[in-house]
Amino acid sequence: MGEGEENGNEADSNERSLALSPTWSVAIVLTVFVVVSLIVERSIYRLSTWLRKTKRKPMFAALEKMKEELMLLGFISLLLTATSSTIANICVPSSFYNDRFLPCTRSEIQEELESGSTVKRNLLTKSLFFNIFRRRLDVIKRTTCSEGHEPFVSYEGLEQLHRFIFIMAVTHVTYSCLTMLLAIVKIHSWRIWEDVARLDRHDCLTAVAREKIFRRQTTFVQYHTSAPLAKNRILIWVTCFFRQFGRSVDRSDYLTLRKGFIVNHHLTLKYDFHSYMIRSMEEEFQRIVGVSGPLWGFVVAFMLFNIKGSNLYFWIAIIPVTLVLLVGAKLQHVIATLALENAGLTEYPSGVKLRPRDELFWFNKPELLLSLIHFILFQNSFELASFFWFWWQFGYSSCFLKNHYLVYFRLLLGFAGQFLCSYSTLPLYALVTQMGTNYKAALIPQRIRETIRGWGKATRRKRRHGLYGDDSTVRTETSTIASLEEYDHQVLDVTETSFEQQRKQQEQGTTELELQPIQPRNDCVPNDTSSRVGTPLLRPWLSISSPTTTIELRSEPMETLSRSSSLPSEKRV
């Protein structure tokens, strides 16, 4: 009897409610939770304030998306806590619970209960959490299901799912921050190449020297300048595949792609391509930090098909590494293709300069690679979160982690794939995807984009309030002059147009926005072999239209500028 009473008192102490708990213990626990929550909240607030002050709007948007993700996971957690007792009291016939859709067999669970394998966990875990299998037996007493029926999901199962959501949130946010940090560090290491390239901003080099620099390609191209291996497609892919494990981008690659981008979009040689690339990557980063609906669907599908004998965790560890290698090889292949075309080793009639185009990418969509990178990063964080969850909730020797060598292999693949994707693939993507047909929205200074958005909002607001008909046009009696060269020092000079220009605008029903370059000083005298001097930033005219507003960007009518995918389609009123 004494031993039975002692066990009963121990069980009662484990299940003690707040009414029987000392007030000091409750106050201490509450204080710890409040202090930790306030520290996290204030840290996020100060980070948001710093991003706003430094005008890093893309990074601020990415942080807001991470906060939305945490809020969503917090809402799911709160919903599970509030409805756990109700769900646990939903009873279904025991015949529905067969061994077909179980991740572990009942015999394995029984062996773990008998051997007490979970008791071998470290002292910290035992002191912080109740024994998981012992509580599983205690929960049976709480259910109200009759004989022959079982809870739809047990109370303990809902608690375990609750903890998985918490681990998933922490792991995904941590992986996202590390990914951006490693990518920024890698891209900033290219800054010295940008500074060297801008030494020729006055366009003073001779044609022979410039042609030598322009044709100075990667070691890959230099190795394949002799036929017939230069046109061997299989050898090119094999070389690109192995090159991503070393120095994925060297100086000649960067200078060549930079020159190709500047020439293709008619920018001056002094344009800061490196800063534009960082702005572009920051804007795209907000697309890879969140968890979209399809990714949540992947989590649900994994929970459904993770049955005994499927080895699903092994396959989900293989998928992200495979995708990282494929994406990295494809990006290297784009560089190799452009370099070979420039060296005259392919049949593509590219002439003497690079021809960036969407056809170089899969399905003519460079943005498809970003979606794959998003899936890779989420998959890696999900793999690590699953490991921590299994080890925390079921023990290191449970049926989920029984094969230790396979667990080590999965973790090694996950860390290697994450590092390769963050430090090599993502920076390479930021550079190579600039070789698409269209430039990205980051090329346009922020103030001009805000001005265009403001006009669009004003138009929609006036139409919504019926201030003018559908055939009306929003007119601005000013001309905006800006330079794309100095992003951090943008100047919007507003000048009045002449009466004749106003009359023409009213007749044509258009609003004109002129982008004129700041003429650079020519500190050297051009000779017969030097190329053009003082090339304007935007040569062709570009029209941005909507059903009610037409905006024209005009400069010298020389070549046709490719339309950015971020701009609406052209439509004349």
Curated annotation (Swiss-Prot):
This is MLO-like protein 11. It comes from the Eukaryota. The chain crosses the membrane at residues 20-40, 70-90, 164-184, 288-308, 309-329, 372-392, 412-432. One of its GO terms (biological process) is defense response. The gene is MLO11. Residues 500-532, 554-573 are annotated as: Disordered. Keywords: Calmodulin-binding, Membrane, Pathogenesis-related protein, Plant defense, Transmembrane, Transmembrane helix. It holds the Pfam family Mlo. It is found in: Membrane. It is a multi-pass membrane protein. May be involved in modulation of pathogen defense and leaf cell death. Activity seems to be regulated by Ca(2+)-dependent calmodulin binding and seems not to require heterotrimeric G proteins. Residues 446-467 are annotated as: Calmodulin-binding. Residues 41-69, 185-287, 330-371, 433-573 are cytoplasmic. Residues 507-516 have a biased composition (Low complexity). GO terms for cellular component: membrane. The C-terminus contains a calmodulin-binding domain, which binds calmodulin in a calcium-dependent fashion. InterPro entries: Mlo. Residues 561-573 have a biased composition (Polar residues).
